[in-house]
Structure formats: C-alpha cells, structure tokens
C-alpha cells in the first residue's frame, strides 16, 4: 500500500554506501521511520527533499508487518535556504526536531503540532535577521505540551481561576501537577513545582500567547534561558513519565 503525506525530516543515519534510514514526522501518520535507497548517491533523485528539517511531500510503501518503510518519492515544498544559512535559526530548528523525535510516539498523529512546526519553519525561511530565534523553541514546547494533553497556564491559576498579575509579587509558584502558576493565597506546601521570579513568569506569558514575530524579537538572559529550559524539560518528564534532557541549546550555551 502506498501512502502519501506531508513530512518534516527529523534526523537520519547512514545505511549502506548509498542509503539512509530517516526518522520523519508526518502530518497524518505521526512519526515514522523510512529507508531511502540511493539518497547518498551523487545521482540521487531526492535532491534536498530528505535533508534534516526539510518539509517534503513523501510517498512510501506501507506495511502493517513492518516498522521501517521504503521511500517511493519525495519532493520538497518549503525552501530552507534562509534557515541553513543562519546558524541561530538552524540550531532552533534542530532543537525542535529533537523534541519531536523524543516526545512523539510512532505513528501517533497530531496534525496541529505538525502545522505549528511547519509554520515556524516557514517563518524562519521567510524572515531575515531575527533578534532571538531560539525563543521560538520555548514557544514550541509550550504548544507541544498543549497538543499532548498537559498544557500549561501562565495567565490564570487552575485552582482558583484568578488571573496572575506579575506586579503582585516578586516570585510565583508553578505547580507541576496543576500545570499552572498558583494564586498567592493557595497553599503549595508539599506540591511538586518550582518557584519562578516575576521576570520569568512575564517571559512565559509572552511566549504562550505572542505571535512568532513578537516572540523572536526580545532577548532572554542566559540565566533565564537555562531556568526556562530546565523547567520545561522537568515538566515534560513528569507528565510523560520519562526523562527528557534536550541537548540542543542556544548558540554559545552548553549543558
């Protein structure tokens, strides 16, 4: 059976002298593994359609008895030149691909998550120099949590329904169990969570509701970047019941 779908290439590895095994995220079939024969040959018919972070229309031979499918054809439909030529954009896209690889189960589709990823890739390729492209990695994580059923609330307490105003306190408690910032009068003793300063809460509120152009236009300090990165990886680990440690960090940062 031949299946065709929109796909984003996540990563791959060599398989024989001329072939590759690739992991891709498709819109309607979720994450799948494919074998691309001849893709490493100088005469490959695939061109750049199977390169990492490429958005391509993919056709493959599907079988219910296999979990590795043979590629029939692939054609790139979203250019990536302005991503590949900009290191900051490229690092952000690789980080997003890493999240899709580690959080998504095989053949479990989330069309809205695919559309968000494609939207970010399109935005990066159409835009010129961005002030802080890596901010969109955090936006992506926030939206991914929502798609996976454990979205976060940074504007309202999930217990009281009270709106969170960063002017009310220097620090706020985020409950991992409730998935939200808690009102100041809620007793959080014994709850698993993290104390966030008002600056970080303000950043998370912006990243949660802002447009891509706005979210990539302001700087986040190195210390706040590490705090947000650690906070989100812990949150995903708790709700997915497996540890996530994403290795791709913003330019100049290491973990």
Residue positions per predicted region:
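Non-catalytic alpha-helical scaffolds and adjoining flexible linkers that form interface surfaces
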Residues: 1-20, 25-255
């Amino acid at each position: 059976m031949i299946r065709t779908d929109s796909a984003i290439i996540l990563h791959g590895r060599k398989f024989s002298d001329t072939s590759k095994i690739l992991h891709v995220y498709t819109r309607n079939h979720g994450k799948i593994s494919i074998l691309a024969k001849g893709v490493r040959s100088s005469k490959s018919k695939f061109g750049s359609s199977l390169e990492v972070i490429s958005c391509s229309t993919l056709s493959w031979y599907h079988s219910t008895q296999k979990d590795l499918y043979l590629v029939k054809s692939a054609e790139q439909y979203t250019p990536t030149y302005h991503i590949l030529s900009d290191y900051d954009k490229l690092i952000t896209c690789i980080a997003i691909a890493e999240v899709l690889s580690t959080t998504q189960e095989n053949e479990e589709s989330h069309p809205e998550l695919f559309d968000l990823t494609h939207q970010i890739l399109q935005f990066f390729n159409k835009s010129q120099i961005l002030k802080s492209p890596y901010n969109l990695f955090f936006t992506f994580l926030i939206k991914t949590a929502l798609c996976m059923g454990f979205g976060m609330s940074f504007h309202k307490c999930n217990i009281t329904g009270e709106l969170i105003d960063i002017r009310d306190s220097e620090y706020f408690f985020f409950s991992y169990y409730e998935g939200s910032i808690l009102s100041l009068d809620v007793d959080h003793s014994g709850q698993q969570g993290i104390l966030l300063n008002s600056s970080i809460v303000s950043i998370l509120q912006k990243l949660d509701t802002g447009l891509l152009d706005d979210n990539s236009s302001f700087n986040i300090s190195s210390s706040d970047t590490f705090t947000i990165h650690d906070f989100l990886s812990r949150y995903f680990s708790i709700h997915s019941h497996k540890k996530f440690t994403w290795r791709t960090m913003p330019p100049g940062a290491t973990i």
